[in-house]
């Protein structure tokens, strides 16, 4: 398995331009994904995930400059999320149930995705993507959380209505200390 944190090396230089149609297709896919998450249409969102999904959010630590490559935990270290399809399905069941105190009442979220850069891979129809995000979450009366960061995805073209599926997602948040009560939502 590719160390998804170190896939950043793919984006050390400006990617070669891709066809505008492909850029638009992928951006529209992300906008649709954000709408599904914001509208809490989790079953439809889950259908965008590949059966071999790896959903990973490493822990970020503050490091001095010479140790900056150790800023994020690796695949064999602790992580906020290190999920496959089965784990994702369990998380989905939990946050949509009436017994999950962390999402009952449900959070109100707004996902904003931007700065989408695309690199075609050696596999036909698969793409490495870097995008930036902001997730705004409001819950109950006064709980407010804002997360910003980068998502590194591998998308695979498929015949589904959305046109792609998410094979791999790595979420690199800008915060090293998470002040939110929980992480009971999806990025």
From Swiss-Prot:
Lineage: Bacteria, Pseudomonadati, Pseudomonadota, Gammaproteobacteria, Pseudomonadales
Name of the featured protein: Benzene 1,2-dioxygenase subunit beta
Gene: bedC2
Involved pathway(s): Aromatic compound metabolism; benzene degradation; catechol from benzene: step 1/2
Role description: The beta subunit may be responsible for the substrate specificity of the enzyme.
Alphabetized Gene3D superfamilies for the sequence: 3.10.450.50
Subunit: This dioxygenase system consists of four proteins: the two subunits of the hydroxylase component (BedC1 and BedC2), a ferredoxin (BedB) and a ferredoxin reductase (BedA).
Family per similarity comment: Belongs to the bacterial ring-hydroxylating dioxygenase beta subunit family.
Catalytic activity, reaction form: benzene + NADH + O2 + H(+) = cis-1,2-dihydrobenzene-1,2-diol + NAD(+)
Listed GO MF terms: benzene 1,2-dioxygenase activity
E.C. code: 1.14.12.3
Keywords: Aromatic hydrocarbons catabolism, Dioxygenase, NAD, Oxidoreductase, Plasmid
Record bears the keyword Disulfide bond: no
One GO process term, biological-process aspect: 3-phenylpropionate catabolic process
Membrane-crossing residue ranges in chain numbering: none
Enzyme class, spelled out: oxidoreductase
